[in-house]
């Protein structure tokens, strides 16, 4: 995965409006074409600018191990978990909004993989 696909999968800024977090996840997973053949089990959208998230790979993050970095700051995000449906267009998600720190993988100072939401 590269920086542009990371942005498509994980960055939504400013946050797309939806009637509720579940509807938000259903909409975004479809709009970003993240379920081409099967419903993705889980996906997190971060509501911060690409430059803010990119900083986690540098001064805005703390090295964890290998190429993984933990953000120093918390980000507004929506965590989407699959609860059924069928790909590509009717996957159903349970969305949970929150403000949390994140762990990402970096290559050449750019985020390339979303590892997890830190509790």
UniProtKB/Swiss-Prot annotation:
Positions of substrate binding = 40-44
Catalytic activity, as annotated: an [RNA] containing cytidine + H2O = an [RNA]-3'-cytidine-3'-phosphate + a 5'-hydroxy-ribonucleotide-3'-[RNA]; an [RNA] containing uridine + H2O = an [RNA]-3'-uridine-3'-phosphate + a 5'-hydroxy-ribonucleotide-3'-[RNA]
- Tissue expression, per UniProt? Pancreas.
Keywords in alphabetical order, please.
Disulfide bond, Endonuclease, Hydrolase, Lyase, Nuclease, Pyrrolidone carboxylic acid, Secreted
Question: Which GO biological process categories is it annotated with?
Answer: defense response to Gram-positive bacterium
Q: Where is the active site?
A: 10, 113
Role:
Endonuclease that catalyzes the cleavage of RNA on the 3' side of pyrimidine nucleotides. Acts on single-stranded and double-stranded RNA.
- Protein's UniProt name: Ribonuclease pancreatic
């Amino acid at each position: 995965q590269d920086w542009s696909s990371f942005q498509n999968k994980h960055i939504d800024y400013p946050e797309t409006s939806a009637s509720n977090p579940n509807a938000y996840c259903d909409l975004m997973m479809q709009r970003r074409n993240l379920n081409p053949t099967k419903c993705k089990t889980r996906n997190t959208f971060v509501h911060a600018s690409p430059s803010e998230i990119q900083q986690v790979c540098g001064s805005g993050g703390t090295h964890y191990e290998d190429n993984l970095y933990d953000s120093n700051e918390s980000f507004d995000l929506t965590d989407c978990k699959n609860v059924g449906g069928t790909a590509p267009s009717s996957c159903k998600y349970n969305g949970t909004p929150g403000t949390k720190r994140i762990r990402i993988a970096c290559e050449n100072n750019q985020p390339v993989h979303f590892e997890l939401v830190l509790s």
